[in-house]
């Protein structure tokens, strides 16, 4: 009896290492953490840099007024200051970050009601905000740029050594990046933390998606598992920005990042318990070369759709909060909540179409999704307040959910159909496409907005999505590799063969004793 009790934890660990569902949980949590950290900085960084740097710029002016003026500013009669972001008044002693007093050397009239102040007061510091578009865009894009550089090495690496080690390396780097965000007080340190996040995200995303594709070999089950895993991505996008804005407003800058660091520790402990290094067979190291996959036109079409659809929301991350600050006089907490409809709709879209796309046709879902992305982006500049952003942002999130949940399984399907069923490289390509969108979007958006304005930027990226959408028709019936050769030699008709998995019974790649029979579930 005593031996049975002592052996129970070992038995549970052994069963857990052979469970596909726990692997799905690990990938879900990893994507959740990555995307919470991705979006939690969206409302924090613009306000934090404004509070620190713009305040420092104006502090030199504070020393300019005469002694009598300074005394008058501290007197009870003139102890109120106007916030040009949320049209509220407060005492100078109750100054919090992101509130800037009128310090031009003259005494402003007492403000008693927000409605009595002209609306153009919310445009104070507009030159600084326009300059911040570029710097914040580069900061946000640095994560995707670094991820873009690392992905081509991570994909083949997972084919060689398996998925456990890259997943755990990704966890450690993400944990370090989260701590750096918590305690960084300058733009340079924030930039380093963001680039570190890109490295960790590359390891976690490529290894996680490749792991799911290896474990779930059935096309229907794979689509469902990918939809659930992308739900973790969606949930991270859902709670990241609102969570960051609320915690920054009422607790402080470090608090959301410390909570995410604790979540990273939980994910690392879960990985350490249930994931073990793969027993890599010689055939698993003979996957299709990355360059060969990049020459496949069908993989390129799918990757282009992923890139352009996600570029739409990537452009909004640095530009929408600043546009709201300039045109809507929005307070800090609204800057994060503006992304809430998109995140909720993305969560619904990924889970709904992870199952429906297999019945409707994944190519059709991706085509409709890209058109919807374009239309939603065209409607964003029409909003005059945060309530006007609900519809366009919700449509954008739902449409991107359609595209991602449809095209991620297609990437694995194309490798099974046209190449060798080793998935590290193809999901590295998918992640590269995602990263290109999140690299080009914020960086170019931050540069273009001061030149042509935010509305025209939305028109351009929305139109590009609509124009690209018809290319998804090529994904309807992609030919198998043997069919392609036969078609070129005119030796067989062009009908598409029925899709069959090359290795229908694939051993669980992460089990400690993969030779032992047992249930996968």
UniProtKB/Swiss-Prot annotation:
The superkingdom listed in its UniProt entry is Eukaryota
Inactivation phenotype: Increased apoptosis and reduced neurogenesis in the hippocampus. Spatial memory formation is mildly impaired.
Gene3D superfamilies recorded for this chain?
MFS general substrate transporter like domains (1.20.1250.20)
Q: Which residues cross the membrane?
A: 22-42, 136-155, 165-185, 195-215, 225-247, 254-276, 297-316, 333-357, 363-383, 395-415, 420-440, 446-467
Catalytic activity from the UniProt record: serotonin(in) + 2 H(+)(out) = serotonin(out) + 2 H(+)(in); (R)-noradrenaline(in) + 2 H(+)(out) = (R)-noradrenaline(out) + 2 H(+)(in); dopamine(in) + 2 H(+)(out) = dopamine(out) + 2 H(+)(in)
Q: How is its activity regulated?
A: Inhibited by reserpine, and the proton ionophore carbonyl cyanide-p-trifluoromethoxyphenylhydrazone (FCCP).
GO biological processes? serotonin uptake
Its biological purpose? Electrogenic antiporter that exchanges one cationic monoamine with two intravesicular protons across the membrane of secretory and synaptic vesicles. Uses the electrochemical proton gradient established by the V-type proton-pump ATPase to accumulate high concentrations of monoamines inside the vesicles prior to their release via exocytosis. Transports catecholamines and indolamines with higher affinity for serotonin. Regulates the transvesicular monoaminergic gradient that determines the quantal size.
Please identify the protein, giving its name as recorded.
Answer: Chromaffin granule amine transporter
